[in-house]
Regions:
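Structured mid-to-C-terminal alpha-helical surface segments
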Residues: 1-162
Length: 162
C-alpha cells in the first residue's frame, strides 16, 4: 500500500499475483490495483456510526451523513469537467433516502432551495448526452434495468421534491 498527499489524499493498494492465484488470470504478474482518491472538503460535519454486518465484517464504521453525501454527489455532477453516469446513479439512489444538505450546496454551488437546485441540474443536463453517460456506467451495474436511472434522469429531477 502506498499513500500520497499532494492537495488530495491518494492511496494505492496493490494485490500482486492474486488474479493468478485465484485462477482468474493465466499471467503470474497480473495484479489488482485499487486507487482511492479523496480531497479535503473544508466542511465541518459530525460523522455517523454505522454497524456493518456484511462480507464477513462485523463492527462500527464512521460514515458521512446521507444528506451530505447526496449534496457532494450533486456537486460532483454539476462541477465535473467530464460528467460521469455514476453520479446520476448515485443521486437517484440517495434521493429517496434523504434531502440534500443545502448548507453544503450553498457553499459549493450557491444553491439554497429546491427550485434553484432543479434549475442548475437542468442547466447541466442540457449539455449532456445521457446515452453516453448510460454507456459509461452500464458495465458497473448489477441490475441492467438500473440503466433507466440515467435515461430517465430529467423526469426524475422534474418529479423529485428536493
Amino acid at each position: 500500500m502506498q499513500q500520497v498527499y499532494r492537495g488530495a489524499f491518494h492511496c494505492y493498494i496493490k494485490f500482486p499475483h492474486l488474479l493468478y492465484q485465484t485462477g482468474l488470470s493465466g499471467h503470474q504478474n497480473a495484479k489488482i490495483l485499487i486507487q482511492l482518491d479523496t480531497e479535503p472538503q473544508n466542511f465541518d460535519y459530525t460523522p455517523e456510526n454505522h454497524l456493518l454486518n456484511k462480507f464477513d465484517v462485523f463492527g462500527n464504521i464512521r460514515t458521512t451523513p446521507l444528506d451530505l453525501l447526496l449534496a457532494q454527489k450533486i456537486t460532483a455532477f454539476i462541477k465535473r469537467k467530464q460528467p460521469k453516469g455514476r453520479d446520476i446513479y448515485d443521486i437517484t439512489f440517495l434521493c429517496p433516502k434523504t434531502r440534500p444538505n443545502y448548507v453544503y450546496l450553498s457553499q459549493r454551488l450557491g444553491v439554497s432551495n429546491p427550485d434553484e437546485l432543479k434549475s442548475i441540474l437542468f442547466d447541466r443536463l442540457n449539455s449532456l448526452n445521457l446515452n453516453q453517460l448510460a454507456n459509461d456506467v452500464s458495465p458497473f451495474l448489477f441490475n441492467p434495468n438500473d440503466i433507466q436511472r440515467i435515461h430517465l434522469f430529467p423526469q426524475f429531477v422534474e418529479q423529485t421534491a428536493f
